Amino acid sequence: MLMSRITPFLVVLAVVLWSAHPLGGAMEERLGLEFLFALRGPIDPPGDVAVVAITRNSARALGLSEKLHEWNRQPYADVTRSLKTLGARTIVYDVFFEAERQAESDVAFQNAIAEAGNVLLFARSEQDAIGAAQLEKLEQPLAQLRQAALGTAPLVLPKVPARVSRFFVRHPSFYGIPTLHGLAWLLQQDDKDKAMQALMDLPVSLPLNLYGPPRAIRTLEFSDLIAQPDVFAADINGAT
């Protein structure tokens, strides 16, 4: 009788102590969240967010290489103009536009970014070893594109575990630098000073709230936005 009463207590205590341990807490977050998401099921995603996916289908439809680094910048100029025309609130690129490509296409993309006035570009976070020390720096995109953009910011993802369960709202190594999604949110607030303070008061990373399986958030093909943008007017108007 005593054993039947004490066993559940010991099990609960073991779970609590294991969760309090850093290793246990990390495992609990990965496995526990996965279980809770499965138990909860899919939920409605935000209606003001759209993902533009660059897939093999888009590459083939545009007659371009499936290797993204081989593309010139004209398709990006075209899709930026489509998004702006359709009323996108903010356009956020997580592609790193590092080096010059075809000069004419670089200028076309630069002009499209400047005309849109609401484009954020990805700045890459890099680590260099100097002796025993690690130096981290932010590499900015191509200067002519950066100067045309509304802003740049890093996109930081955890290197482990393989399943992403958290996201960063600020760069973990640089004080006061929001990530791309943090900056996108910040720029949409009326009181930016207050919003920045709220962002700084948050933990540097937060648990990710999964809405459902892949493409649960409205996802559009890159090539479709170029070929037939008007079809997606309702999806893009007012969205980030």
Give, region by region, the residue ranges found by the protein language model.
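Active-site Gly/Thr loop motif
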Residues: 202, 206-221
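Non-transmembrane functional regions of envelope-associated proteins
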Residues: 2-207, 236-240
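Extracytoplasmic
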Residues: 220-240
